[in-house]
């Protein structure tokens, strides 16, 4: 019977309550569900803000990710200069939301000698119909004199080949991201992460241990952390290793399944 069946929602996205329609959707989800399992504290807090009276329905289970398939790395997909520190920003070409613009602003603040020791790969494609965003990004790279240091690579399915060839993963989101899969992938592949203090990102990075967390409105802070990575390549490696340890302990698919089923059993 539908009426006596418990309705449990798994909430992956942050629909900002500042938008009327988003708030209505959040309120309906809270009112008509028995429970909502949220993938991050950021998601949970956003839902709570919509209807605080339903706080008891909200539960936190951090997401996990599986790499059960056989991973075959193809180095031909991305050829890098191994004498440099190679940074990768993997995600849709959405310069404001995904932080490509923030990164370019940060690069303009780097001393020339630091820039010469690094390269930055923007891996991803624009949404169909929004190709102008990539055109504008390319134009900005040219105007800022960064063409030598920044390469845009269209999205590829063999994303593991990108991780195999970069040293640092950049997640400089400027709009709330619930629990970026990119960070989980980065940790799995032993890459340290520099991410912004927004959405679920701070819940995924141990600042100073597995990577760095920077302010989403501070190109200067991002540039300082990039510079630190270039100057301290040994720490880039060690932070990546710590990230893998952290991933195995908290974000593997087995850990996720255990947490998720424990939550479900508690709710039944």
Predicted regions mapped to residue ranges:
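Carbohydrate-associated surface elements
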Residues: 42, 64
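Active-site donor-binding acidic/aromatic loop of nucleotide-activated sugar
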Residues: 128-134, 146-156, 162, 212-213
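Conserved acidic donor-binding segment of nucleotide-sugar-dependent glycosyltransferases
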Residues: 207-208, 212-219, 228-234
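Short, structured helix-loop element that forms part of the nucleotide-activated donor/catalytic region
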Residues: 119-147, 235
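Acidic donor-binding loop of glycosyltransferase active sites
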Residues: 164-178, 191-192
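Short hydrophobic beta-strand element within catalytic cores of glycosyltransferases
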Residues: 192-195, 205
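A conserved mid-protein helix/loop that constitutes part of the nucleotide-sugar donor-binding site
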Residues: 94-109, 120, 220
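A short, well-ordered alpha-helix in the C-terminal region of glycosyltransferases
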Residues: 221, 228, 235-250, 256-262
């Amino acid at each position: 019977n539908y009426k006596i069946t418990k309705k449990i929602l798994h909430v992956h996205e942050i629909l900002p309550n500042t938008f009327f329609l988003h708030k209505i959707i959040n309120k309906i989800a809270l009112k008509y569900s028995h429970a909502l399992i949220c993938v991050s504290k950021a998601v949970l807090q956003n839902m709570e803000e919509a209807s605080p009276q339903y706080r008891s329905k909200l539960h936190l289970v951090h997401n996990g990710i599986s790499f059960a398939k056989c991973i075959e790395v193809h180095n031909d997909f991305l050829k890098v200069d191994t004498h440099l520190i190679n940074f990768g920003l993997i995600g849709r070409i959405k310069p404001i939301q995904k932080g490509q613009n923030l990164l370019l602003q940060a690069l303009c603040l780097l001393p020339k000698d630091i820039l010469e020791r690094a390269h930055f790969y923007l891996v991803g494609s624009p949404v169909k119909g929004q190709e102008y965003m990539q055109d504008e990004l390319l134009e900005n790279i040219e105007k800022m004199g960064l063409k030598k240091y920044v390469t845009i690579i269209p999205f590829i399915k063999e994303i593991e080949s990108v991780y195999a060839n970069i040293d640092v993963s950049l997640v400089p989101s400027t709009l709330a991201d619930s629990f970026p899969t990119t960070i989980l992938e980065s940790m799995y592949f032993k890459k340290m992460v520099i991410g912004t203090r927004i959405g679920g990102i701070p819940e995924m990075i141990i600042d100073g241990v597995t990577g760095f967390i920077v302010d989403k409105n501070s190109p200067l802070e991002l540039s300082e952390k990039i510079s630190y990575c270039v100057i301290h390549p040994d720490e880039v490696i060690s932070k990546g290793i710590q990230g893998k340890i952290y991933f195995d302990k908290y974000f593997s698919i087995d850990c996720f399944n255990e947490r998720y089923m424990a939550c479900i059993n508690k709710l039944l």
